[in-house]
Amino acid sequence: MAGRSFTFVSGAGSPLSGHLEPPEGTPRGWAIFAHCCTCGKDSRAAVHISRALSRAGIGVLRFDFAGTGIGGGTGEPVNFASDVEDLRAAANAMAAAGMSPSLLVGHSLGGTAAIVAAADMPDIAAVATIGAPADLQHILRLFGPNDLDTIASEGEASVEIAGRPFLIRRGFLEAVEGIDVEKAIASLRRPVLVMHSPLDQVVGIDHASRIFVASRHPKSFISLDNADHLLTDVADANYAAAMVAVWASRFLPPLSADLPQVEVAEGVVSTETLAGTFQLKVRSGEH
């Protein structure tokens, strides 16, 4: 089924731009994908993982947090607390549209936000993180040498992260000090999947260890061998997507046996699998 736009209002009252990836037939569940700090809803990881979940029967909303992407939040200050509220607002908007989510998937800081947000989202059955930091102090290491002084003296600063400017205000630093991520993980008591590359140069593998240890069972860990933090290699993005889809299927209702039949085109139909170069799915009639 073709994707479509989905705009909703953030906790702060700003419109946020989203994209729905519905599955064919009756969804077995709905998920929200939270992008990384320097990404957006159309990043490679966001797109591939959303589409993989859709093929597994799980509909997905990926959206731009306030301050990123093309949504109405563009130009607003980056604020971890608002990211958490944006996730909750997205879930409420989906529920109002008859698509109540039961899965959160977060990449990098989006994974940390998903963990914190899920604590107050009882309908969320499971949380998956990809390259997520185990504490918010980690992001301060990405700031320039004078950024913290500027924020302290002027209340805000334009901070360059991964080549992009982000408006950071004093409230962000207060959130960094005030949120205990590992405590939030320990109190979550929901299935957690931790995915991380041992070669991650942005968020070290030790963060994955801390998240995994703090999580309660059932919990799972998958190593993203040779992947970089942003999953820029399409093969790494596809692998992560496939693993999330398989893992999530254990915590959602089974695929319905009476799914609507997809109209079969005459002749031979080939479609890209998105699993790598030269890989096609070929269908001839009903075969």
Give residue ranges: language-model regions.
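Conserved alpha/beta-hydrolase
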Residues: 50-72
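Catalytic histidine-centered segment of alpha/beta-hydrolase-like enzymes
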Residues: 227-239
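Catalytic nucleophile-loop/oxyanion-hole region of alpha/beta-hydrolase
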Residues: 41-42, 68-99
